[in-house]
Regions:
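Alpha/beta-hydrolase fold catalytic core
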Residues: 1-35, 56-59, 97-98, 279, ...
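Conserved HGGG/HGGXW glycine-rich cap/lid loop of the alpha/beta-hydrolase fold
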Residues: 17-77
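Conserved acidic catalytic loop of the alpha/beta-hydrolase fold
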Residues: 83-100
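Conserved alpha/beta-hydrolase catalytic His-Asp/Glu region
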Residues: 135-138, 142-146, 158-221
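Short beta-strand/loop motif that positions the catalytic acidic residue
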Residues: 223, 229-231, 235
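Catalytic active-site module of serine/aspartate enzymes centered on a nucleophile-bearing elbow/loop
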Residues: 254-285
Length: 285
């Protein structure tokens, strides 16, 4: 069980059985709650271009840092999706949230789907999967458009041998830096690197193992709430064919929005278009 403790301007969820573990979150606004679950290897700060828009729409907006990232404590283990979904469940329970909306970006889509699998949808109104890893990243015989095992092995090897250098190149691919007419700045790359490089090395590696290897295809039947799927057709990290399109085919009630020319980090490069898409999804009953 997690208990809420608050430092000045810094709310945390603290586990009763492990006082050394604290999950950091930020909670603003009122109204129906939206929880924003960030991607790998960043933190809740990655939603900064979406939070003001959602607040202006009248929602209560909650971001949190996955364990080992941002201001949340690292642990030795517990980075599989059952444990990560448990952290989300505790956040919802301890904050006494009802009729929740869940937005998962990239790796964060896994927490959303596993939450629905393990805890059901009774307390969930709708969800959004943005540049999500759902349902499967890894290439297999029945998933030919996935990322090859060799590429995934290369990522894990680089994380173990030269993590900070790998993260620099990763975020260029994250935004298709140098390939888009709508580029992000070098400062944005530096900002992301500063967040990612400060994450726990253990958490970074173990979370990569989780998103690279978890097959959510059998769990798509558990997604029984209204769903928005947003994916860029030029995503170099999680290709649309292995993720967005398959998710749209496997989830019963969904709106599938393809961002033309969108990279993985379309929450930054195409923030205005994404925010318009989220607004339409939230306001159309």
């Amino acid at each position: 069980m997690l208990n809420i403790t608050k430092n000045i301007n810094m709310p945390y969820l603290t586990k009763q059985d492990n006082k050394n573990f604290e999950l950091y979150y930020e909670d603003f606004g009122s109204g129906q709650p939206i929880i924003l679950i960030h991607g790998w290897p960043l933190s809740g700060k990655s939603w900064e271009l979406q939070v003001p828009v959602l607040l202006d729409l009248g929602y209560r907006v909650i971001t949190y840092d996955r364990k080992g990232f941002g201001k949340s404590s690292p642990t030795l283990d517990g980075y599989d999706y059952d444990n990560l979904a448990s952290d989300l469940h505790e956040l919802i329970t301890q904050l006494e949230l009802k009729n929740v909306i869940l937005f998962g970006f990239s790796m964060g889509g896994g927490e959303v789907v596993r939450y629905l699998t393990n805890y059901g949808s009774e307390n969930v109104d709708k969800i959004a999967l943005i540049s999500s890893i759902i349902p499967l990243v890894k290439q297999k015989d029945d998933n030919p458009h996935g990322v090859s095992e060799e590429e995934l092995y290369g990522i894990l090897t680089s994380l173990k041998t030269d993590r900070v250098t790998f993260l620099e190149s990763f975020h260029k691919n994250f935004y298709n830096y140098g390939l888009l007419s709508q580029k992000v700045s070098q400062k944005q790359l530096d900002y992301d690197w500063s967040i990612a490089s400060c994450a726990s090395p253990i958490a970074t590696i173990k979370c990569a193992e989780s998103w690279a290897n978890t097959d959510f295809r059998p769990e798509l039947v558990n997604v029984n709430v209204k769903t928005l799927i947003v994916h860029g057709d030029d995503d170099q990290i999680v290709p649309i064919e292995t993720a967005g399109r398959q998710a749209a085919e496997g989830i019963a009630d969904n709106d599938f929005v393809i961002i033309e020319g969108g990279p993985h980090g379309l929450n930054v490069t195409h923030a205005e278009l994404l925010n318009e898409t989220l607004t339409k999804f939230l306001t159309n009953n």
